[in-house]
Amino acid sequence: MSKQMVEEAKLFGKWSFSGIEVKDLGLKRYVSLTPTYAPHSMGRHEHGRFRKAEVNIVERLVNNLMRPGPAAGKKARAVNEVKNAFEIIGLRTGQNPIEILVRAVENAAPCEDTTRISYGGIVYHMAVDVAPLRRVD
């Protein structure tokens, strides 16, 4: 019986998920870095509460690119856009584009937001903390 070498899954066959860590402890549970070949999970996360936290971070980027309008529902187009962007990032920086995406999410995630509180018809804006799952979105 011959031993088969198990090849790790690389995104688009080029970029590895190994060695990438989330430095922000608040986002660590919500940024999924599960290895995958293509960012397409066929919507398996839709049937449970908070299951979108288990979706790969690259697929979440692709899903957010499909906003209502001209790009609505065109996932193949969004995947190709992300693939081309990752190739450009890889050529210009020489680093793993997945790691750059994770750092960008960490740096761009807001920590505070404001909410409206009304007392007797007067509206006050009050600072509140942002949930980690919303910070990733």
Language model segments and positions:
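Strongly charged
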Residues: 1-79, 83-137
